[in-house]
Swiss-Prot record:
<keyword id="KW-1003">Cell membrane</keyword>
<dbReference type="GO" id="GO:0005789">
    <property type="term" value="C:endoplasmic reticulum membrane"/>
</dbReference>
<dbReference type="InterPro" id="IPR027835">
    <property type="entry name" value="TMEM174"/>
</dbReference>
<dbReference type="GO" id="GO:0055062">
    <property type="term" value="P:phosphate ion homeostasis"/>
</dbReference>
<feature type="transmembrane region" description="Helical">
    <location>
        <begin position="73"/>
        <end position="93"/>
    </location>
</feature>
<protein>
    <recommendedName>
        <fullName>Transmembrane protein 174</fullName>
    </recommendedName>
</protein>
<keyword id="KW-0472">Membrane</keyword>
<keyword id="KW-0812">Transmembrane</keyword>
<comment type="function">
    <text>Regulator of plasma phosphate homeostasis. Decreases serum inorganic phosphate (Pi) uptake by regulating the sodium-phosphate cotransporter SLC34A1 trafficking by PTH and FGF23 in the kidney.</text>
</comment>
<dbReference type="Pfam" id="PF15029">
    <property type="entry name" value="TMEM174"/>
</dbReference>
<keyword id="KW-1133">Transmembrane helix</keyword>
<feature type="transmembrane region" description="Helical">
    <location>
        <begin position="40"/>
        <end position="60"/>
    </location>
</feature>
<dbReference type="GO" id="GO:0016324">
    <property type="term" value="C:apical plasma membrane"/>
</dbReference>
<comment type="subunit">
    <text>Interacts with SLC34A1; regulates SLC34A1 internalization by PTH and FGF23.</text>
</comment>
<keyword id="KW-0256">Endoplasmic reticulum</keyword>
Amino acid sequence: MEHSSNRPEDFPLNVFSVTPYTPSTADIQVSDDDKAGATLLFSGIFLGLVGITFTVMGWIKYQGVSHFEWTQLLGPILLSVGVTFILIAVCKFKMLSCQLCSDNEERVPDSDQTSGGQSFVFTGINQPITFHGATVVQYIPPPYGSQEPLGMNATYLQPMMNPCGLIPPSGAAAAAPSPPQYYTIYPQDNAAFVESEGFSPFVGTGYDRPDSDADQLEGTELEEEDCVCFSPPPYEEIYALPR
């Protein structure tokens, strides 16, 4: 007979450890700083190139020309402003940082992520379950070969009985999970059934009931036969007295 309900061992349970990455406020601040630093860096480079160009135009090629005198003053000013922007982008926003500084910065977010905890996802059941920041112990079900088969022999389920209905002293009957059957306790070849064949027990429809006198008579006869069956043999039959 097959069991309709599945036991918990029948469901394979899988556990996956997932480390979610949640963007923090520091990451958002770093992205804004990168934009500002990149803007200052490219602005400083552009102003520096323009300042160098004006300086060269005013002091080398156009000497003695009054129309280009303003370039001699504007060129160094733009060059100084461009260099200032580049220094601010490098020093404050760390646009051109060294490899050692970048490694140290990468280690700090890693430590923040590990301290936040992990997430565990359970699959193999009706609905996946996720635990955040919890300590989970994985349960491995036993192999299917170690389980007892569903179909067992009837000899292991029914205890062995003698004709009188006595259970042997062995532990086979104690290990039987089911109660004994009626025909094993009182078989058809029992003396109680053989000798009482002359009587008519419960013949007819299943709804007819015998009289109370017949019930009492049959009950007393069965009790006497049971006593005879369960009573030990007399001592004289086992050990004959010497004459």
